[in-house]
Amino acid sequence: MGTMVPPTDAPPLDEAADHVLSDDVNWLLNRVWLGFGERRAAALDALDLTVREHVVLDVLSRVDATQLQLGAIARIDKSALTLTIDSLERKGLVVREPDPRDRRAKRPRLTPLGRDRCAAASRVSRQVQDQILDSLPKATREIFVSTLREYAFGQFSQATYVAQSR
């Protein structure tokens, strides 16, 4: 099968109302997700973190949990979480300690460097989020965030990050 080439008469993507996919919610959400993700990833890259690594650090900064509990809270599957914690451990941001109640279980803990990096990452992530959302009128922004929250903690509350098989 040959390479697909877009038609030369395709409209620019910035013609929102007239774009052929302007009523496709999945496509729209994907574009927003990609835009947020690209900006956040670029900001976190300066701190030598991925978005997923920041999510794990952020959860660890808030709760004392086993690795299994951490995965459930962050909605990251076991394989992806193991890879993420391995990376954070190599960077000196996390250590794994045996759970005193179950020696088979591990409790990831932030190192002092991990705590500092998490705080910095949270600041830059919030700045990126605010820069993006500040482009919306306040009432629209509140409705947008409220609607996302309803979906995230409602019908998509069990959605999980899955390890990429590459």
Explain the meaning of each model-derived region:
Residues 1-47, 166:
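N-terminal leader segment of winged-helix/HTH proteins
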Residues 24-28, 55, 105, 131:
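Amphipathic alpha-helical recognition patches that constitute DNA-binding helices
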Residues 34-80, 160-166:
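N-terminal helix-turn-helix DNA-binding core of bacterial DNA-binding proteins
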Residues 37, 86-149, 153:
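Charged, amphipathic alpha-helical coiled-coil/dimerization segments
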Residues 68, 78, 83-93:
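Carboxylate-rich helix-loop segments that flank metal/cofactor sites and access channels
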Residues 142, 153-166:
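Short amphipathic alpha-helical interaction elements located at domain edges
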